[in-house]
């Protein structure tokens, strides 16, 4: 192992390399190295034409993280699960300056593992029948025919998709401490992500592994149980500028996010608690949706007679706000349910906002792709996921036709395995209804692709049931005219029952709810 500066690390990256980068959503990546790469490109024009591999692109949604690499000429293409927090990459893709592919998160984790094992492909059912599938029968589902990396395999017991592996030349990772040999600990990190698999994949390809850390010790006294990346996988270590090594883009350091300290009194407060919206009106709309979703969690908890706690999955964005409503002002860890996140964090309270992907007081950290892999354990009891659009046949897209597409997130992985599926979203966006005649891309067929045959759809105007592809209004918000405000404004047919019940009164207003099951 060799200790180098961030500028030296940036100089190691050559033109046209394929590199994989750590970080997850608002959980920081190797920011010192990314900042040095940005400066080097500005001054020299190199490296050029990079190919990026990532899970959920790290970034602050403005200028940090992978947004730093979103420069014409610097990046040529990328494969990732989503780039919501690196919208500059999405802007380049919209301008056809960069080619971005989105894969299920479970596949990306398996992709790293296949490279580490010397295999040339990943076989997975994730993505079958969606727009990722090149042989999907539905034209809405058909993938880009110019993507040769995904093919359908039909000669096995059941159809699968083959995701082709390609050599990766460098991994840019991060940890907390390194000893003189390059053993890396992660005790102050907010998750493990897929960093071990990334390092193994690059090592198998003969590439270089560069790890940014906060501290380099001068003794061999690291606790072996704390070492996540062993020295034989690490080529270079960079001591980070502390201002470029925050835990998340909203929190420089909080021991509750890394699990070093437990207790609700230590929850971080401040900007990182902000929701994804920035207007007071939209915040109120989101509050109605998340509170109504919280009641679904309450109902499932009260109805459960299992000896083990319910396993709940909160997707990124709006669903991450639901736990805050449940726990606000109360004991935050009810023993009857456990939250999981796409980032691999299990337990505790998801923070969301500018700490999206992190939880306060987590129970454990898994690799990001592990909770979503099929066959690696049971599915979740309930998944709360965001949606962008739903059409007349019950097909779901993660983005509205008028919104930028920023990757599939966990919908493709999670919905087919969840016992109960709850979809959250505003009724409209920019004046356009989210219920449309035809989605742009099929991310989920609620009729055939969801484990829950009758998913719930929650908006601020009403609650709907998806039954055999038909949207049925079952609850309506106070003051809403069903015909004028919902049916007439919808872009697809909505069936209304004779007397839809009113949405619960407690989901409206600003008063904290005294959830009866929290004692």
Task: Report the location of each language-model feature.
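Glycine-rich beta-strand-to-loop/alpha-helix junction loops that act as flexible
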Residues: 20-29, 54-56, 313-321, 343
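Short, hydrophobic/aromatic alpha-helical segments in well-folded domains
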Residues: 197-198, 292, 296, 321-322
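Anionic-ligand anchoring segments at beta-strand to alpha-helix junctions in alpha/beta enzyme folds, i.e.
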Residues: 125-126, 313, 321-362
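N-terminal glycine-/serine-/threonine-rich phosphate-binding loop
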Residues: 1-45, 51, 255-311, 329-330, ...
């Amino acid at each position: 192992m060799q200790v180098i500066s961030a500028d030296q690390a940036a100089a190691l990256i050559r033109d046209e390399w394929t590199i994989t980068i750590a970080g997850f959503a608002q959980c920081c990546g190797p920011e010192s190295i990314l900042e040095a790469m940005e400066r080097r490109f500005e001054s020299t024009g190199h490296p050029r034409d990079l190919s990026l591999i990532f899970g959920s692109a790290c970034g602050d949604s403005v200028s940090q993280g992978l947004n730093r690499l979103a420069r014409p000429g610097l990046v040529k293409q990328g494969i990732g699960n989503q780039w919501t927090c690196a919208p500059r990459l999405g802007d380049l893709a919209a301008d056809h300056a960069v080619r971005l592919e989105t894969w299920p998160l479970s596949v990306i984790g398996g992709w790293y593992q296949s490279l580490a094992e010397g295999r040339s492909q990943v076989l997975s059912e994730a993505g079958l029948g969606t727009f990722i599938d090149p042989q999907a029968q539905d034209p809405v589902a058909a993938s880009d025919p110019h993507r040769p990396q995904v093919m359908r395999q039909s000669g096995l017991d059941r159809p699968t998709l083959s995701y082709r592996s390609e050599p990766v030349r460098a991994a840019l990772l991060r940890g907390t401490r390194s000893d003189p040999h390059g053993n890396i600990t992660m005790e102050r990190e907010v998750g493990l992500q897929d960093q071990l698999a990334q390092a193994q994949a690059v090592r198998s390809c003969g590439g270089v592994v560069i790890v940014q850390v906060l501290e380099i010790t001068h003794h061999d006294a690291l606790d072996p149980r704390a070492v996540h990346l062993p020295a034989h996988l690490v080529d270079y270590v960079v001591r980070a500028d502390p201002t470029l090594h925050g835990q998340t883009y909203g929190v420089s350091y909080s021991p509750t996010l890394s699990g070093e300290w437990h207790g609700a009194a230590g929850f971080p407060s401040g900007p990182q608690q902000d929701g994804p919206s920035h207007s007071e009106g939209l915040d109120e709309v989101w509050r109605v949706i998340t509170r109504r979703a919280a009641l679904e969690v309450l109902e499932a908890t009260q109805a459960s007679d299992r000896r083990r706690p319910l396993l709940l999955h909160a997707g990124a964005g709006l669903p991450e706000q639901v736990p805050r409503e449940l726990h606000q002002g109360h004991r935050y860890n009810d023993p009857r349910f456990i939250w999981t996140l796409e980032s691999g964090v299990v337990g505790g309270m998801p923070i969301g906002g500018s700490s999206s992907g992190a939880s306060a007081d987590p129970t454990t950290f898994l690799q990001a792709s592990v909770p979503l892999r099929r066959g690696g354990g049971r599915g979740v009891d309930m998944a709360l996921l965001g949606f962008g659009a739903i059409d007349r046949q019950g097909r779901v897209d993660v983005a509205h036709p008028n919104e930028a597409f920023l990757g599939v997130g966990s919908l493709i992985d999670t919905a087919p395995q969840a016992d109960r599926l709850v979809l959250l979203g505003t009724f409209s966006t920019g004046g356009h209804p989210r219920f449309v005649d035809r989605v742009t891309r099929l991310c989920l067929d609620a009729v055939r692709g969801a484990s829950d045959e009758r998913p719930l759809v929650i908006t601020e105007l009403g609650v709907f049931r998806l039954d055999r592809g038909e949207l049925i209004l079952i609850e309506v918000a106070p003051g809403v005219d069903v015909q004028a405000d919902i049916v007439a404004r919808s872009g697809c047919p909505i069936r209304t029952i004779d007397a839809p019940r009113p949405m619960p009164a407690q989901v409206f207003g600003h008063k904290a709810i005294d959830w009866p099951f929290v004692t």
